[in-house]
Every structure is written in structure tokens, then in C-alpha cells.
């Protein structure tokens, strides 16, 4: 019972937080629509091109789609694929649908809670969840639910906060607890000065003020994927090279701690975030 209470309390806090201002949105629908053309998903994530060029990849779902940039971008590049973005925040879903409509895209966005999607089985050819599950009450359960949505040989594109890369950033802002929110925002912009003020503030809130997050490692997620009958194809930790040994990635990821500290000392933003591309066996 205590677990259930904690579970729903976390969900409620996160929903309230994002209802106030969803992550990665702009001051207007027009600006967001233009950004899709100038910053598309294939540029951000090159390993996806080979997958999406495959005609067998037909049904795509993005879990925790937020403002919709990822799916809207992919839909603009692959208009004939069936693409769905789901998020539990109505404000974000409405925003994403407006951007999609502005661009005359075929993708759609629906309000759904991942933890209520247990009945969706063997449906999708590709699933993504980028920067989402570490804000849920149980990241591993979320991964298991998404894995069940996927068909055999389908793909899972997962992005999570990285324990080694993220911790220095958290410490950096913990040392500023006495500062006002406005001052913290200025400090954040010293690291990552995005040109659109609302966009920058949505990033700042998400990165610095979020009420709940968990940190993860390649080693941890690799073991979980193995238990779910998935094979990791590549990871951002080694710049998505497909030729790797697990032990080398595990050693490499630990070095991200010092890299993160060095970037902060140089007043540079370091994401503290890693991505894994996995395939269901």
C-alpha cells in the first residue's frame, strides 16, 4: 500500500509540474513548426535513418512525447508511416497536435499513461522513450511495458539520465540552493543559452527544478534488456558505434563523470544523458 501511495504521489507531482510548462516547447506554434525543419530527428540521432528507411518499419510509438518534436520531425520525413505519440499531460498533447496540424502531418498525439498500457502487446515496429522514464515512479516497469508493445525484431530507442554524467550537474546546482529561481536560470543559461526564452526556461525547469528523477547506467539497462530478450545494437556512450564489447562500454561510461565535471568548469553544458538502441530477439 505504501508503494502504491508513493507511486501515485510521484505521478501526480510530475503531472502538475509539466502541466504548468511542458518540456521543450516554444513561445509559439509557428516557431515550433519551423524548428522541425531546421532540427530534425535524423540529424540529432543518425542511427535512426537506416531503421526508418526500412519499409517494414510501419508502426511507431513514442512514449512520453511531450511537445511532440521527435514524432512530428519523423513524420515530416516519413509521412507514410503510422506514428503515434502518447503523453499523460493534456497540455503537452494539445501543443503537439497543434504543431502537427500546422505542418499538415499525419502523425497524432493522444493522452495516455504508460502504466495503463499493459494490454498493448506485439503491436509496434519501433518504440521510443527519450528522457521520460527516469521521471516515472518505476523506470524498469516502464521499460518492461514498452518491451511488450514491440513485435519480434522491432526496435526500442531509449534515453535516460546517466548516473555518471548527470551527478556533477546535480551537485553544481545543489550548491546554489540559496539562490532565487531567477538567478539559477541565469546560471543555467551560462551553460546552455537557447535563443528562445520560453524554450530555454522549459529546459531549465526540466533540468534543474524537476520534482522527481532517477539515474541509470548502461550496465544496469543492458542487464534488464537481456532479461527481456533484447540485444543492444548501439549506444550514445560510444557515439553509436556498433562494434563494441560490453565491458568496454561499462568502463567508458564511468569516465563520463570526469568529463561532466570538466565541462561544467568550462561553463559548458553536458547532457548527462545516454541513449540505447536495442532490438527485440
Q: Where are the language model's segments positioned?
A:
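Conserved alpha-helix/loop element of class I SAM-dependent methyltransferases that forms part
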Residues: 31-56
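Class I SAM-dependent methyltransferase "Motif I" SAM/SAH-binding loop
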Residues: 64-68
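A short acidic, Gly/Pro-enriched loop at the edge of an enzyme's catalytic core
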Residues: 118-126
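A short glycine-rich, Lys/Arg-flanked "PGG" loop and its adjoining helix->strand segment in the class I
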Residues: 141-152
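Conserved class I S-adenosyl-L-methionine
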Residues: 155-188
Amino acid at each position: 500500500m505504501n508503494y502504491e501511495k508513493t507511486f501515485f504521489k510521484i505521478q501526480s507531482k510530475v503531472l502538475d509540474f509539466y502541466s504548468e510548462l511542458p518540456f521543450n516547447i516554444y513561445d509559439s506554434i509557428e516557431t515550433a513548426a519551423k524548428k522541425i525543419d531546421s532540427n530534425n530527428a535524423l540529424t540529432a540521432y543518425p542511427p535512426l535513418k537506416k531503421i526508418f528507411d526500412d519499409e517494414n518499419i510501419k508502426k511507431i510509438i513514442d512514449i512520453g512525447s511531450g511537445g511532440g518534436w521527435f514524432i512530428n520531425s519523423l513524420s515530416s520525413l516519413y509521412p507514410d508511416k503510422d506514428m503515434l505519440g502518447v503523453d499523460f499531460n493534456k497540455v503537452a498533447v494539445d501543443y503537439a497536435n497543434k504543431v502537427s496540424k500546422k505542418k499538415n502531418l499525419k502523425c497524432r498525439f493522444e493522452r495516455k499513461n504508460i502504466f495503463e498500457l499493459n494490454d498493448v502487446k506485439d503491436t509496434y515496429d519501433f518504440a521510443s522513450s527519450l528522457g521520460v522514464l527516469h521521471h516515472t515512479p518505476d523506470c524498469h516497469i516502464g521499460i518492461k511495458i514498452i518491451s511488450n508493445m514491440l513485435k519480434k525484431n522491432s526496435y526500442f530507442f531509449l534515453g535516460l539520465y546517466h548516473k555518471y554524467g548527470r551527478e556533477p550537474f546535480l551537485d553544481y546546482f545543489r550548491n546554489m540552493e540559496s539562490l532565487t529561481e531567477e538567478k539559477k536560470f541565469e546560471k543555467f543559461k551560462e551553460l546552455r543559452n537557447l535563443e528562445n526564452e520560453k524554450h530555454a526556461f522549459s529546459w531549465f525547469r526540466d533540468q534543474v527544478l524537476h520534482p522527481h528523477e532517477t539515474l541509470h547506467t548502461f550496465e544496469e539497462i543492458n542487464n534488464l534488456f537481456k532479461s527481456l530478450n533484447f540485444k543492444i545494437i548501439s549506444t550514445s556512450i560510444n557515439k553509436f558505434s556498433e562494434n563494441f564489447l560490453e565491458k568496454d562500454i561499462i568502463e567508458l561510461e564511468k569516465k563520463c563523470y570526469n568529463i561532466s565535471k570538466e565541462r561544467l568548469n568550462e561553463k559548458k553544458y553536458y547532457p548527462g544523458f545516454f541513449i540505447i538502441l536495442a532490438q527485440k530477439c
